[in-house]
Structures are given as C-alpha cells and as structure tokens.
C-alpha cells in the first residue's frame, strides 16, 4: 500500500529564458516524477502591505512618496505568462496591491484571449487590495481567489492607514467574491 500522495508543486521563474530552459529539458504541465507533479507557474508580482512594497495604483496614504514595487514590467509578465500558458501551464500569482492585481488580470485576460483554453484554472494568491471594478474583472475571467485569512488580523490594523478608508472598505471583500460566485479557497503561505 502506497500511502504517499502526489505533491502538486507550483513552479516559479523570473525570466522567460529560465522557463524556456525548463521546457527544453522536456518538463510539461502536469508531468509527474514519482509523487511529484508540476502544477501552475507562479508569478511573484509585488511585495507586502506593511512594508509598503505591495504595488498600488495610487501612492500609499501614509507614505505619499511610494506606490510599492511591481516586480515585472507589463511586457516581461506577458512574455513569461504567454510562454507558460502556451505550454499548458495554469497561471497563478502573488498579488497584494491593486496595481499588481490589475497588471496580472490584464496579463491573464490578454493571454487567455489570444490563446483560449477552457480547461485552465488561473488564479491569484492574496487578492487583498482591490476595488469593486477590479473584483468584477476578476470574476469575468473566472479566476480562482487563493485568499489568506490569516493576514486579516494584522492587516486590519494598518489597511486604512496604508490605502485610505474608501479603498480599505472595498478590500479583503471576500464575502462579495462569494456572492459573485468567485471560486475561492483559504490557505496559508506554508503551501505556496
């Protein structure tokens, strides 16, 4: 009796040449190696709210000199996502700030329009700072929200200071996702 389950592993690349080398070695989406299965390609698109490195569309309310940090240009993210997507990989991304969320939503929309695949389950991890217009776009793309409730307690103390009361009110609005029919799961960074 084999008691081990298959580990579905997200894989992360920073540049297209890294992913291309991986593909050149023959690794494909859903390939297995024993109990190891290649899952989605993961993009780390921004940082964290408390450090002011989550990428925001507007300057931080309590630090007007910064909007955080996008870790990809639009074209870098598109090129990497396109290479992963056209080779059968689902796309998933760490996005906390609304600029990172918008960038990834734009990228997924562009790639999935150019290369439609009904079987893809693309998703975004965190989904924290997002107004209702972005939430609506998220739903229309049928993305999975990998929410992390563990951060609510710490972030609730700083969210309004960081993004202002109006955007803070619309953020972490996972009840609205549920009402809209967004597929969600709660998890922690341990599995990422």
Q: Predicted regions span which residues?
A:
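Metal-coordinating catalytic core of metallo-dependent amide/deamination hydrolases
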Residues: 1-98, 102, 137-144, 149-150
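Short helix-capping segments at alpha-helix termini
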Residues: 2-3, 31, 111-119
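Short, hinge-like loop/turn segments at secondary-structure boundaries
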Residues: 25-26, 109-112, 142, 162-165
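Flexible glycine/proline-rich, aromatic-decorated loop/lid segments
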Residues: 56-61, 143-177
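Conserved helix-loop functional segments at active or binding sites
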Residues: 83, 106-114
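Short beta-alpha connecting loops at secondary-structure transitions
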Residues: 118-122, 126, 155-166, 185
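Short gly/Ser/Thr-rich phosphate-binding loop of adenylate-forming enzymes
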Residues: 131-136, 176
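Conserved small/polar residues in nucleotide/adenosyl-binding loops
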Residues: 190-192
């Amino acid at each position: 009796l084999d008691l081990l389950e298959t580990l579905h592993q997200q894989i992360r690349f920073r540049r297209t040449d890294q992913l291309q080398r991986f593909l050149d070695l023959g690794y494909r989406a859903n390939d297995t190696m024993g109990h190891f299965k290649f899952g989605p390609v993961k993009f780390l698109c921004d940082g964290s709210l408390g450090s002011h490195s989550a990428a925001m569309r507007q300057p931080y309310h309590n630090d007007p000199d910064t909007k955080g940090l996008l870790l990809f240009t639009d074209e870098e993210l598109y090129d990497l996502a396109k290479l992963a997507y056209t080779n059968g990989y689902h796309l998933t991304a760490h996005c906390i700030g609304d600029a990172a969320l918008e960038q990834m939503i734009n990228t997924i929309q562009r790639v999935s329009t150019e290369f439609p695949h009904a079987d893809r389950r693309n998703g975004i991890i965190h989904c924290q700072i997002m107004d209702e217009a972005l939430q609506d776009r998220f739903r229309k793309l049928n993305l999975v929200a990998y929410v992390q409730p563990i951060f609510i307690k710490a972030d609730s103390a700083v969210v309004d200071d960081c993004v202002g009361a109006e955007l803070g009110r619309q953020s972490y609005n996972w009840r609205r996702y549920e009402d809209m029919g967004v597929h969600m799961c709660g998890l922690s960074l341990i599995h990422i």
